[in-house]
């Protein structure tokens, strides 16, 4: 009986170890937003000096920016940034009058004590933090940054060829992301993940359905479903 118990507990232990291993596997779901702490302690400490305190600009995207910076800095730098209003912040966002930046452009500059991120309009503050996070994520030094980004195209959209029945014309990677049968009552959290990923690379529009459109999409009940998705995307500067 002792031998049987030993074999039993050995199997359970092995199975538990396998489950733990599976639970920590990188599935790729987060794509490039899978924030993991780097190994270069010197660059990490330098980044922490900037990232410990952040001053937001007071834009309509402040809450989204706050959540993204908290998520990134906790994972990459193992700190929880403080959000302040004063000049002591190591990362400072503020509105500027440089109209050449357009409605979605931004600047990132760094000095010895702070990184400044000016933009002329709200969307610039949504887009600006992502490349800054990416530099930290890739272990790049944050000294003497002088980045100026202005989108070359006004409309940068993803064109889905999704049918209302969940199929995708010429689709080879599963069913449609949109769960029309659940909307608008249930809004899947994946829609927010999708929008966040798009915003991180400057996508500002999405076409939900196939170009060979099912006319039901224009019915009142389906427009309510579309509106539920639009409410999620709007928070991240994405239009349907």
Task: List the predicted regions and their residue ranges.
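Acidic, contiguous N-terminal accessory segments
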Residues: 17-123, 138-148
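Feature activates predominantly on carbohydrate-active enzymes
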Residues: 59-68, 72, 99-240
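Enriched - but not universal
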Residues: 14, 35-38, 164, 181-183
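Bacterial Sec-dependent N-terminal signal peptides
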Residues: 1-21
